[in-house]
Amino acid sequence: VVGSLKSQGDMPGGIVALSAGGTIKWQYEISESVSSTPVIDKDGHILFGTERGNFYILDANGTDAIAVLDVAGAIANSESAYASEWAATQGKFWSSPVVDADGTIYVAITNTQDESKSLLVALSSKYVKGLPTTGWPMRAKDAQHTATVK
C-alpha cells in the first residue's frame, strides 16, 4: 500500500509505503504536501503531484526521484492561452493522476491564485510505460475508475 503525506510545521510531506501488516516499508520525504493518491506504473514507478505544482516520478523502491516536473511553471511559461493566467508558483495538484495503457499521464492542476481555474494536463515521460495488468495501481483501481474486483 502506498499513500501520501501532508507537510505540517516541521513534519515533511511525501509518500509512504506500508506492508500488509501496516508497518512502514519506506518513506520518501519532501518539503511539499501531497494531497492526492499516487499511481504505480507498469515498471513499479510511483507517480504523484504536490500542492506546489510539481509532479514526481519515484523509482520502484521509493528511494529516488527519477523525474520532477514543474508543471505549474511549464504552463506559466508556455505559449498556451492559459499562460497569462498562471504564475510558476501557483499550481496545486489535488486530484489523483491517471495513467493510460500507453503511459500518458493525465492530471488536473488548479491555479492557487484564486482556485477558480483548473486544467487537465497530459504529461509524458520516458520513464512511464503504462499500467500494470494486475492489482490496484491507482485510485479507484483503473483509468475508468471502476473500483471493482473480479
What residue ranges belong to the model's regions?
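Extracytoplasmic/lumenal domain signature
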Residues: 1-150
